[in-house]
């Protein structure tokens, strides 16, 4: 009886396995369509005579960083921006970032949206590429901003001549 039982169980298993193979539909193979290059972001031109248009240099000592953080920001009237930073520790200067993108001021909030970092196109949806500051004061030769976070640091920049570059 056990050999009949084993034979029957073997036949049932074989039928189930074959039935499973017959009932399955072949998986359709779809090729991934390559994504096209991301569409460039359209910058919004600044208002005519906007006092923030120009070249701004700041030198600060961020919390938790031992050294001077230097930043050069160029804000163009057409809404484009270029942002370059370097960190100076003692006599050594370390270049950090070279970013380009768009800028705007809405309701007293200055926003920089990076579209390229060190020559590479970035994911515009990534929040690391958006910097926001409250505009505290804009003078002819001085710009005062505050980071938009609890206990945000004040950043003071001074206007530089067009074409000014960071000292290396």
Language model: regions and residue ranges:
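Sec-dependent bacterial lipoprotein signal peptides
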Residues: 1-19
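Lipid interaction determinants
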Residues: 7-10, 21-106, 111-168
């Amino acid at each position: 009886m056990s050999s009949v039982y084993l034979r029957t169980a073997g036949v049932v298993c074989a039928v189930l396995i074959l039935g499973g193979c017959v009932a399955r539909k072949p998986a359709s193979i779809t090729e991934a369509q390559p994504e096209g290059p991301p569409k460039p972001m359209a910058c919004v031109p600044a208002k005519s005579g906007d006092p923030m248009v120009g070249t701004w240099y700041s030198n600060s000592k961020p919390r938790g960083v031992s050294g001077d953080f230097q930043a050069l920001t160029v804000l163009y009237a057409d809404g484009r921006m270029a942002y370059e930073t370097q960190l100076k520790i003692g006599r050594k200067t370390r270049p950090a970032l070279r970013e380009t993108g768009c800028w705007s001021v809405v309701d007293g909030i200055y926003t920089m949206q990076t579209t390229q970092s060190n020559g590479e196109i970035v994911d515009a949806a990534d929040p690391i590429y958006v910097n926001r500051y409250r505009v505290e004061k804009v003078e002819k030769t001085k710009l005062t901003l505050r980071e938009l976070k609890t206990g945000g640091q004040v950043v003071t920049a001074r206007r530089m001549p067009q074409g000014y570059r960071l000292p290396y």
